[in-house]
Every structure is written in structure tokens, then in C-alpha cells.
From Swiss-Prot:
The gene is mdh. This is Malate dehydrogenase. Substrate binds at residues 85, 91, 123, 154. NCBIfam families: MalateDH_bact, PRK06223.1. GO terms for biological process: lactate metabolic process; tricarboxylic acid cycle.
Length: 319
């Protein structure tokens, strides 16, 4: 059904490679093209994945783009490229470094795969999605950030752990930015259709909300030398599949807002309908006053990052 579909993945580290592996095992597309500065590493991973695909009789080919020019005519491009935060590096330093990496990468995507849908995974996620949108010149429906599916999955996992039942039947809902200011919505979270608020006390729900906000940091604390990649990669692969298969399913994703939820010129996580044209529709759900305040705070955190980029003349042309 998906013969001929091409997916480019820029950044073949843990997240990028695991996205590729997940898609290859499912046979979601005809070809996956890895692009990484470490070309030999990318080639080794591509060979390994191609052989794994052969083992499960998947038709998917995994190849390597030695140059951006080899990343042509992709239907979807996943961007995971970026620098981790190193000792002595401020958050603003990291923001500028990754914004410049994103700018370079997106210029190549816009040139060689001008009809692609871009899925951003690089951090800080919401700000990098904003950069990708501005630098590509694409319609906002074709530049989407991966965050909400991951954060919702983390919340669902914590709910199952706390309850001790309901695995596979939990629908957790998270909005807002991918960070400390995300907005987990217990009111819209259910277990087999039963509202979470009927199954847990307010204090238990608050514990889960706090743990969800710190979900990534909790994993880093255990790993010591790395960060999460299985769940982020699976969340990304789900987005790719929804687009390639034109499922029209609703998923929480980071998109550019133009008045939705009362906010504009900012990227934040909201429910969207994913299909062949990307984020085809933004779903506006009703929020109570406290949820609106939390969502506004989340958007303002992203605006602070955008302001930092503007102060550094990042978007000025010709410099």
C-alpha cells in the first residue's frame, strides 16, 4: 500500500536510528534514508537494519545519504539532529547551537524535498519546530513537532503503574510545550472510557502529573550518560505512519498556532488530525480556567526562547 514512499531521517543517533528500525520492521514505507555527519556509522546501522528487515520479510530498504543532495523527494523527513547540553553550556548557548543546526538542515530539506512533511524531534522541541517552520517557508501543516504522543504515553504508563490494571486501555492527554510547563489533562484522561478522576484521588493524580513533567529527567537519572530514545522513537514512528497511511487520527503534536486557544505566533502541543497533508486540522477542546492559565504559561515559556532567538538576530536575513 505504501510502495514508493520515502522517509528521510536526519540524525542517526539513538532516536533517529530507532525510528528507522521501527519503520523498517513494520514495512511502513519503501525506503528509509539515513543522513548523519558520521557517514560510516550511518552505513553500518543501515546495513544492520536492512538485514533485520530481510529477517522479517519486510520490503523496506534502508540506505544512507552521504550528502543532503541525496535526500531527495522524501514524503516525510524526521529531524533528530542537534547537540546535547554539555558541561558549562547555558540553555541559551544550547538554544543557539541547535537553532543553527536546524537552520542548516532545514535549508537542505526545503531544497531537495520541497514537498515533504517535516517532523521535528530536536530539542528544545517547540522552539526548533518554530525555527523549522520559519526557515522552510512551508505551510504550518507540514512542520510538526513530536512531543505530545511521548508525554501522553509516559503519563499512561505511570497511570497503569499506579493503578495496577488497564494496560492498553489508558488514554492520557497532555497539551502544551515539551518541558517543565507541559499541561497534563487529567480531566481528559480515561481508563477503558472511565474518567481518571473517578479512579484516583486528587493527590494521586497530582503525583502522576509531576512525574509526567519530569519523565525525561527520570530516565536520564537512571542512564547517567544518555537520554530516552525507545519511547521518543516509537512516538515519532507513529506520526510517520499516520501521515503515510493518511489515517486522519487525532494525536497531540506541536504545531504553529494562529489564534487557536487564543494564542498566535508560537508553537505548542495541541490535538491535531494527522493525515497525508500533515497536521490537517487543529482540534480545539474546552479548557477550564486553571488549564487555560497553565497552557498560557507553557506558551509563554516557548515565547521566551523565541525572544532569545530574535534578540540574537537569528531570523534576520542576509547576516
Amino acid at each position: 500500500m505504501n510502495q514508493g514512499k520515502r522517509v528521510g531521517i536526519i540524525g542517526a543517533g539513538n532516536v533517529g536510528a530507532t525510528v528507522a528500525y521501527s519503520l523498517a520492521m513494520l514495512g511502513s514505507c519503501h525506503e528509509i534514508i539515513l543522513r548523519d555527519n558520521k557517514i560510516d556509522v550511518a552505513k553500518g546501522k543501515a546495513l544492520d537494519m536492512s538485514q533485520a528487515a530481510a529477517a522479517v520479510r519486510s520490503h523496506t530498504i534502508v540506505s544512507v545519504a552521504e550528502e543532503m543532495a541525496d535526500l531527495t523527494n522524501c514524503d516525510v523527513v524526521v529531524v533528530t539532529a542537534g547537540s546535547p547540553r554539555l558541561p558549562g553550556m547555558s540553555r541559551d548557548d544550547l538554544l543557539m547551537i541547535n537553532a543553527n543546526i536546524t537552520k542548516d538542515v532545514i535549508a537542505g530539506v526545503a531544497k531537495y524535498s520541497p514537498d515533504a512533511i517535516i517532523i521535528m524531534v530536536s530539542n528544545p522541541l517547540d522552539a526548533m519546530t518554530y525555527v523549522a517552520l520559519k526557515e522552510s517557508g512551508f505551510d504550518r501543516s507540514r512542520v510538526i513537532g513530536m512531543a505530545g504522543i511521548l508525554d501522553s504515553a509516559r503519563m499512561a504508563s505511570f497511570i497503569q503503574e499506579k493503578l495496577g490494571y488497564g494496560g492498553g486501555q489508558i488514554r492520557a492527554s497532555v497539551m502544551g510545550g515539551h518541558g517543565d510547563d507541559m499541561v497534563p489533562l487529567a480531566r481528559y484522561s480515561t481508563v477503558a472510557g472511565v474518567p481518571l478522576t473517578d479512579l484516583m484521588s486528587t493527590s494521586e493524580i497530582n503525583e502522576i502529573v509531576i512525574r509526567t513533567r519530569n519523565g525525561g529527567a527520570e530516565i536520564v537519572g537512571h542512564l547517567k550518560t544518555g537520554s530516552a530514545y525507545y519511547a521518543p522513537a516509537k512516538a515519532t514512528a507513529l506520526m510517520v505512519e499516520a501521515i503515510l497511511k493518511d489515517t486522519k487520527q487525532i494525536h497531540p503534536c506541536a504545531v504553529f498556532l494562529e489564534g487557536e486557544y487564543g494564542h498566535s505566533d508560537v508553537v505548542s502541543g495541541v490535538p491535531v488530525m494527522l493525515g497525508a497533508n500533515g497536521a490537517e486540522k487543529i482540534i480545539e477542546i474546552s479548557l477550564d480556567e486553571s488549564e487555560k492559565i497553565m497552557f498560557e504559561g507553557s506558551c509563554n515559556s516557548v515565547r521566551t526562547l523565541i525572544d532569545t532567538l530574535n534578540k540574537n538576530k537569528f531570523f534576520d536575513k542576509g547576516e
